[in-house]
Amino acid sequence: MCAKKIVVLPGDHIGPEIVASALEVLKVVEKKRPELKLEFEEHKIGGASIDAYGTPLTDETVKACLEADGVLLGAVGGPEWTNPNCRPEQGLLKLRKSMGVWANLRPCNFASKSLVKYSPLKPEIVEGVDFCVVRELTGGCYFGERTEDNGSGYAMDTWPYSLEEVSRIARLAAWLAETSNPPAPVTLLDKANVLATSRLWRKTVAKIFKEEYPHLTLKNQLIDSAAMLLVKSPRTLNGVVLTDNLFGDIISDEASVIPGSLGLLPSASLSGVVGKSEEKVHCLVEPIHGSAPDIAGKGIVNPVGTILSASLLLRYGLNAPKEAEAIEAAVRKVLDDTSIGGRGLYTRDLGGEASTADITKAVVEELEKIL
C-alpha cells in the first residue's frame, strides 16, 4: 500500500493549534480506513521559518510540498515580523506560485443549520445558502503589466487573460457542478458589459458548457449585481460561482461573513482535478482566517475551518469523498443544537465557552462513530 504524503505547515501564532486539531481528525480517518494510509511531514513557513532559517519559505519546504499529495496550512503572519523585504506572507505567495495552483475554492454554507442565527443577515435570507466560489488565482490584473505613479500623477494596471486560463477553470467549475448531488448550476460573475476580458470569459465559458456540458445549467451575472444579491438574496447564487481573480477576491470575502464567523470556513487551492489531469495535481488547503496573535496560546480558537480544510484535502487532494463527507457530518453533529440531537458546542467567536480542545475531542468522537 502506497501512503499518501501530506505536508503540514503549522505557520504562526494560532496556526499550530488549529493544525493540531485537524491532524487529530485525519488520524481518526487513517485509523478507521486502513486502506487510506497517510504520512505526515511537518515543515515551517512564514514567521516561524524566518525565525529558524531567515526566510519565510525554504527550498526544502517547497520541494516537500511539490512531492506531496496535499499540503495542510495553518496561518501565517504577525506584528513581530516587520522587515518589508522578509515578510511571513511572502512565504505563502511563493508557495502558491511554486505549486502552480490556479483555482481557489471557497465554500459558503452553514456547517450546521443551527449556525444560521449567528449570521449578520436575517435567518430567512440566509437559510439554505450553499455555494462555492471558484476563483481564478494566477491571472488577471494582479499579474498584468503595470505602471506605477512616478510623480507624474498617472498609474496603470492591465487585466490580461488567455483562452487557456479561462478554459481550464471553466472545466474545473463544471466538474464541481457535475459531482454535486444533484448537479449544481454554475453562475459566471463578470463585467462583460464593460471589460474585454470579461467578454472573453463569457464567450469561452459559454462555448465549453454548450459543447462539453450541455446537461449543466450556466447562468451569467454581472459582478456588481452579484454583490447586491449576496446580501439581498444569496440563495440565488447557490451552486458553483465562477469568476476571475479580482472579482473572486472581493466576492469571496463578502460571502465569508454570511456564516457568522471566519473561524468556520475552509478553502482549497488546486492545480487541477485528481484523476482528470495527466500532470500531478497539487492541493493546498487552509482556513480563511489569519494568525490571530491576540488569542494565540489561549486554547480558545475555533478549529472548525481547519478541520473542514482537512475535509477538502481528502476530497480534492486524495480523492476520498466519503471520508470528507464523514468529517463534515461529524462537525455538523458537534455544532447542531441539542434540541435537534447535536452537542451544541461553540467556541467564543460564536458566543460559546467551548475550548479548541473541546471541539476537537467532540469531532473526533463523532467521527469515530460515523466511520
From Swiss-Prot:
InterPro entries listed in its UniProt record:
IsoCit/isopropylmalate_DH_CS (IPR019818), IsoPropMal-DH-like_dom (IPR024084), Isopropylmalate_DH (IPR004429)
Q: Subcellular localization, per the record?
A: Cytoplasm
Q: What PROSITE patterns does UniProt report for this protein, alphabetically?
A: IDH_IMDH
Instruction: Tell me which UniProt keywords the record has, alphabetically.
Output: Amino-acid biosynthesis, Branched-chain amino acid biosynthesis, Cytoplasm, Leucine biosynthesis, Magnesium, Manganese, Metal-binding, NAD, Oxidoreductase, Phosphoprotein
- UniProt catalytic activity: (2R,3S)-3-isopropylmalate + NAD(+) = 4-methyl-2-oxopentanoate + CO2 + NADH
Q: Where is this site: Important for catalysis?
A: Y142, K191
Write out the GO cellular component annotations: cytosol
Record-linked SUPFAM superfamilies = Isocitrate/Isopropylmalate dehydrogenase-like
Specify the domain of life of the species encoding this protein: Eukaryota
What's a single GO MF annotation on this record?
magnesium ion binding
Which cofactors, by name?
Answer: Mg(2+); Mn(2+)
Q: What class of enzyme is it?
A: oxidoreductase
Residues that, per the record, bind NAD(+): 78-89, 290-302
Residue positions annotated to bind substrate are R96, R106, R135, D224
Q: Which residues carry this modification: Phosphothreonine?
A: T55
Entries under Pfam families matching the protein: Iso_dh
The residues forming a coiled coil are none
Listed binding positions for Mg(2+) are D224, D249, D253
Q: Pathway, according to UniProt? A: Amino-acid biosynthesis; L-leucine biosynthesis; L-leucine from 3-methyl-2-oxobutanoate: step 3/4
Q: How is the cofactor bound?
A: Binds 1 Mg(2+) or Mn(2+) ion per subunit.
Q: How does it assemble?
A: Homodimer.
Q: What task does this protein carry out?
A: Catalyzes the oxidation of 3-carboxy-2-hydroxy-4-methylpentanoate (3-isopropylmalate) to 3-carboxy-4-methyl-2-oxopentanoate. The product decarboxylates to 4-methyl-2 oxopentanoate.
The protein depicted here goes by the name 3-isopropylmalate dehydrogenase
Q: Which organism is it from?
A: Schizosaccharomyces pombe (strain 972 / ATCC 24843)
Gene symbol here is: leu1
